[in-house]
Curated annotation (Swiss-Prot):
The keyword Ribosomal protein applies. GO terms for cellular component: cytosolic large ribosomal subunit. This is one of the proteins that bind and probably mediate the attachment of the 5S RNA into the large ribosomal subunit, where it forms part of the central protuberance. Transmembrane segments: none annotated. Keywords: Ribonucleoprotein, Ribosomal protein, RNA-binding, rRNA-binding. The gene is rplR. It holds the Pfam family Ribosomal_L18p. NCBIfam families: L18_bact (TIGR00060). This is Large ribosomal subunit protein uL18. One of its GO terms (biological process) is translation. PANTHER family: 39S RIBOSOMAL PROTEIN L18, MITOCHONDRIAL, LARGE RIBOSOMAL SUBUNIT PROTEIN UL18M. The keyword Translocase does not apply. It comes from the Bacteria. The lineage of its organism: Bacteria, Pseudomonadati, Myxococcota, Myxococcia, Myxococcales. Part of the 50S ribosomal subunit; part of the 5S rRNA/L5/L18/L25 subcomplex. Contacts the 5S and 23S rRNAs.
Amino acid sequence: MAKHVTTREKRRARIRRKISGTELRPRLTIYKSLKHMYAQLVDDVAGKTLVSVATTSKALKGELGDEDKTGAAKKVGEALAKAAKAKGIEQVVFDRNGFDYHGRVEAVAAAAREAGLKF
């Protein structure tokens, strides 16, 4: 039986073959579900997550209030950049994880850039 592979999954695999993160310049990867947004900085060499932020995290839950999904994505980007700065991370490689660079994905990236991360 053939496996069903979506175009997003194909795009994701193609992108992941080309980019990887290191400790000095980790990979900023995002995932979005219908309701939540997740972002993390990954060191692919060591196979470790350095920083992780999501709309489900306790720190952001109280801050979000009645934000729409795009507004919540901006808060995730800001919180991720703040946590990265605290760990001494200035530059990242952006991995949109096969999602279109539009809407919530763009909001996370823009907020992280405004907060000081360099892509």
